[in-house]
Amino acid sequence: VQDPKVIRELADEVGLIICATHEPSHKILEEPLEVVERLNILGCKHTAFPHPGSYAIDSMEACLVLANKLESAGKILRDGGKQLSYHNHELEFVRYANKSILELILTNTDSKFLQAELDTFWVQKGGEDPVEWCRKMKGRLPLLHLKDYVVTLEREILFGEVGTGSLNWDAIIREADEAGCEWFIVEQDTSTRDSFESIKMSFDFLMQKAEAQNQ
């Protein structure tokens, strides 16, 4: 389903809030007003730039060009009452002049116009520490994508339900909360289980953490 009106109706029927979206990269950069209109229909404040796609990030200069485009789009979204964030994968941890691509993009944009939607799995896959990145993004982390990092006995790396892998969730949740995170979003690309069982496992784990924190 792509029609935002249909998506909104389905969400309203079951009492779901649409907390954030991923829109096509070219739509965000080339047609940001259309993105604002779509988010208005969805009743949603946040969207994230999902992937560089055809936009080059193969040099420091290319990263700075992309950063400029993102800031320009972010200004338009902000004028429309929306917030643009950047969603990372592992490729954003390639380094130029000792700075990762993600650092280059975020340090060369105004945080009002571009925030971060960190993905815990991909930060780890990129060789970085999700806890440290949550700490670094204080005041700039409205959205956090949560999936665990599972390494099998055969050294295969898998997406995991939150709490089933090797990530330090107590520290991640603490640092993200202190950073001002508004939405903790479970996003598991694939699962070895039924999808509904998978999401329930992650939800139950996070609720247990929340209850323990509030005691």
Language model features with spans:
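Histidine-acidic metal/acid-base catalytic patches
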Residues: 43, 96-118, 122-215
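Aromatic- and glycine-enriched glycan-recognition loops and surfaces
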Residues: 3-5, 65, 168-169
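Glycine-rich, proline-tolerant flexible connector loops at the mouths of alpha/beta enzymes
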Residues: 1-11
